[in-house]
Design a protein with these regions (language model features):
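Bacterial signal peptide processing site
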Residues: 18-20
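Positively charged n-region of N-terminal signal peptides that target proteins for export
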Residues: 1-4
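Low-complexity, Gly/Ser/Thr/Pro-rich intrinsically disordered linker/tail segments
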Residues: 228-231, 244-284
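C-terminal motif of bacterial Sec signal peptides marking the signal peptidase cleavage site
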Residues: 13-16
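N-terminal mature-domain "stem" immediately C-terminal to a signal peptide or N-terminal signal-anchor/transmembrane
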Residues: 24-74
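Acidic/His-rich structured neighborhood in mature extracellular/periplasmic domains
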Residues: 57-204, 208-213, 221-236, 249
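Outer-membrane beta-barrel translocator/channel fold
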Residues: 238-243
């Protein structure tokens, strides 16, 4: 009986310790939980703008801000979150968003990740006109040709950066990463250690083996977090996400785009400015 009582007491102790540890773990997790805003409130947009203006040209940030405001107003804040909250992958009412946009903007399809990233960085990074194949940028070209977002010379630099480049026929992402490093090194992306262009690079072999920046955004350092700025697609909203570390942002992006591959191509990979980012997730 005494042994049973001792055993019972130990079990209670173990369970209570487990609950306590779980509680501590939950508290620690909550401290680093990512939060997201669509910048549809004045407060959140001001917060993001102030962060960006620490590192980027004021006129570029102002132009970006006007694009955010125009998009959010056009879709009447449908499905948008003003304040930062833990839901970083929300569901959007795309049918309503598309109807509102088309009814007010007509044939202008709006802007995407590449256009908004370039707007923010265009007067901070370098410029180099190199031969390009912008076949995969048909929608980007339509958006830029039907707006005054970029000047003719800025368009040329945009196409030079984001058009697809040739690579080798291999599934080795490191080979492709080196090719992309060589390409992006032309544009002086490392102009400030506290802000960077982060890209998701896709390997395609439909016409020939090539690399294409399928998604891109800007990552800025704050005192206790990193702020990630992205426009998901032409139709989808802007998102500003706070991550505890750079690695959290990189993993979020890889997890989102990891299936953009085929049996004959490499998995997507992440670039920070002109450097390949190594992730354990590549091995899975």
């Amino acid at each position: 009986m005494k042994k049973i009582l001792i055993l019972f007491t130990c079990l209670i102790f173990l369970v209570s310790c487990g609950n306590k540890n779980d509680a501590v773990k939950d508290i620690a997790t909550n401290k680093t939980e990512p939060t997201m805003s669509n910048m549809s409130s004045k407060e959140s947009l001001v917060e993001v703008t102030e962060t960006l203006k620490k590192y980027l040209k004021e006129e570029d940030v102002d132009q970006f801000t006007s694009l955010v405001e125009d998009y959010n107003e056009t879709i009447e804040n449908t499905s948008l979150h003003g304040d930062f909250n833990p839901e970083i992958n929300p569901e959007y009412d795309f049918e309503k968003i598309d109807k509102l946009w088309t009814s007010k903007k007509g044939e202008f399809i709006g802007t995407n990740c590449r256009i908004n990233t370039f707007v923010l960085l265009k007067n901070s990074i370098g410029s180099k006109n190199i031969p390009y194949d912008n076949e995969d940028l048909a929608f980007d070209m339509s958006a830029l040709d039907n707006s005054k977002i970029l000047s003719d010379s800025e368009k040329e630099n945009f196409y030079s950066i984001f058009s697809k480049i040739k690579t080798e026929k291999t599934k080795d992402y490191k080979v492709h990463g080196k090719k992309m490093e060589e390409h992006l090194s032309n544009f002086n992306l490392n102009f400030n250690k506290d802000i960077s262009m982060v890209s998701v690079v896709i390997h395609d072999d439909l016409d020939y083996d090539s690399l294409f920046i399928g998604h891109v955004g800007v990552l800025a350092k704050e005192e206790d977090h990193y702020l990630w700025i992205e426009k998901i697609s032409f139709q989808e909203p802007y998102q500003a996400i706070k991550f505890a570390t750079k690695e959290d942002c990189f993993k979020y992006l890889y997890d989102k785009y990891k299936d953009y591959k085929s049996e004959t191509t490499s998995h997507p990979f992440i670039m920070e400015n002109d450097k390949l980012v190594e992730l354990d997730e590549y091995k899975n």
